[in-house]
Amino acid sequence: MRISCLLACFCMLALFCACAAPEAALPEPPAAQVQSPEEPPAPVEPPVEPIIEEEPEPALLLSEPVWLLGRLTELYQADETQWAALADVLEAAKTLNADAQLEGLETVQFQGREYIPLAEAAQRLGLEWGEAPDGLRYLARRQTVGQIPEGWNVPVLMYHAVGDEIWGYSDLFVSEAGMEEQLRYLQENGYEPIWFSDLAHIEDYEKPVILTFDDGYDDNYTVLYPLLEKYQTKATIFVIGNAMGSQHKMTQEQVYELAASGLVSIQSHTYTHGNLSAMDEPALRQEMELSNAALAAATGQIPYVLCYPEGKYSHLTMDVAKDYYTFALRMDGWTYQTGMDP
């Protein structure tokens, strides 16, 4: 029995020990690995282009325009230099077949266009400065006429207005059909219409003839000019300087177009069509200088022939005219006489 009690006590003690013993610690799970987010790649910087500083545009100020070989051309000024658009100067130079003369000149950029110093360009092109009656300056070419051989007698055919609408003195008019008939006759019979400048090499022509038209009537542009083109005939038109754009007279633009055609030579019929034989020397010089200035501005060419209005002149007229012209013309009745001393 004692053994039973001991056994019971032992069992209870074992049970107590079992209850009192702490439970064995379970192993902790491994800590979760926290991954940091990947950083985006650094942006690739584009290559930095070197900064090229553009030259600032020159400070050009708009100046008064100038008549450049018959065309009104804008000018800009900086300090003492006047600049014209290179395209305008090149166009003028091409009419002289001298555009190569402008090579190497300094140019500047302004408002999207290229400009060239006008004074230096004019010098290279052999142009002369002057002041037109409208107060603007002009640049024009002086035509050099060679030595005229002596002993030649060249017929000069004188006309005025051409057309079928007669509004003035009828003897001044030739009809359109009549004008064409005469041009056709000259062509079919071997006559060669020339300009006064062609007299320097008159021996090159077998049957030379000069066609002149006085006063610069507007029908010289509307009626005569198409006929000259049709028959490829040269003519000389004597224009009154202050009459351009007036009633029945050609405009300055029409005069320019004729002068640029290669068929028409524009020459002087004085500035006011006054009576030269009654003028003193200052008045004569004013007539001739203003006439030349007006026509030089309109055409880009300085006249070298003078037609005395109504054929009136004096010895003083001839003396003064020699300072401005190579040829002068007067009428004997209805016949023209040429030469500085008719």
Where are the language model's segments positioned?
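Acidic (Asp/Glu)-rich catalytic clusters
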Residues: 187, 224-233, 249-268, 322, ...
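Positively charged n-region of N-terminal signal peptides that target proteins for export
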Residues: 1-8
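C-terminal motif of bacterial Sec signal peptides marking the signal peptidase cleavage site
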Residues: 15-18
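Short, well-structured secondary-structure segments
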Residues: 155-158, 192-196, 210-211, 229-245, ...
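Substrate-binding clefts and substrate-entry loops adjacent to catalytic sites
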Residues: 267-282
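Primary recognition of N-terminal secretory signal peptides and signal-anchoring hydrophobic helices
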Residues: 23-152, 157
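Short beta-strand and adjacent tight-turn residues that come in two discontinuous sequence segments
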Residues: 131, 238, 269, 330-331
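C-terminal active-site subregion of NodB/CE4 polysaccharide deacetylases
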Residues: 143-212, 217-219, 278-342
